[in-house]
Amino acid sequence: MVALDCDAQRALELAEMLKGKATWVKVGMTLYYAHGPSIVHAMKERGFKVFLDLKFYDIPHQIEGASYSAASKGADMLTMHTSGGVEMMKAAQRGAVRAAEEFGYDVPATLGITVLTSMNDSTLAEIGVSRGMADQVKLLAELAQTAGISGVVASPQEASALRELLGPD
């Protein structure tokens, strides 16, 4: 997967160079907010699968709509913050499924962000979370599993503990 953390012109240049050599591109907030759905369309047009990493976080109704919109543009993978809760994650899944059915796409993978990799025990405490990093990640990953989303994003240090807790998939 190639992260397109650059401007649109450079992203399109990279896409041309990577055609046939890479399958996935990641479109993050900066590129998407600057250029909107057209950047997803441009990558799909060039044959790439698109990981749309917008880290949704809002009330369930808004997230269902955001997920529907992203999936309707052809995103193959979406992200959301698991700290939004089970209902928010279920809403994201509903929106993605509904768009896929309406537009004839495969249902995009829905991934939950547990704790941002820039955070640590101190920043968790700063926002009122009394659990340590490892325990918070486990709790949020369990919520993601309960919600039925496709998986979670976590640091490599947490991967084995999460597999043990949640299973190999």
Model-derived regions: residue spans:
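Conserved beta-strand positions in the central sheet of alpha/beta enzyme cores
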Residues: 23-26, 51, 79, 153
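Conserved anion-binding
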Residues: 62-66, 71-150, 155-160, 165-169
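Active-site beta-loop-alpha junctions enriched in small/polar residues
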Residues: 3-7, 28-32, 57-59, 83, ...
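Active-site cofactor/substrate anionic-group-binding motifs, chiefly glycine-
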Residues: 26-29, 40-59
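N-terminal glycine-rich anion-binding loop in soluble enzyme alpha/beta folds
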Residues: 1-21, 97
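Catalytic domains of carbohydrate-active enzymes, especially glycoside hydrolases
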Residues: 17-26, 73
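Anion (oxyanion) recognition and catalysis
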Residues: 19, 44, 104
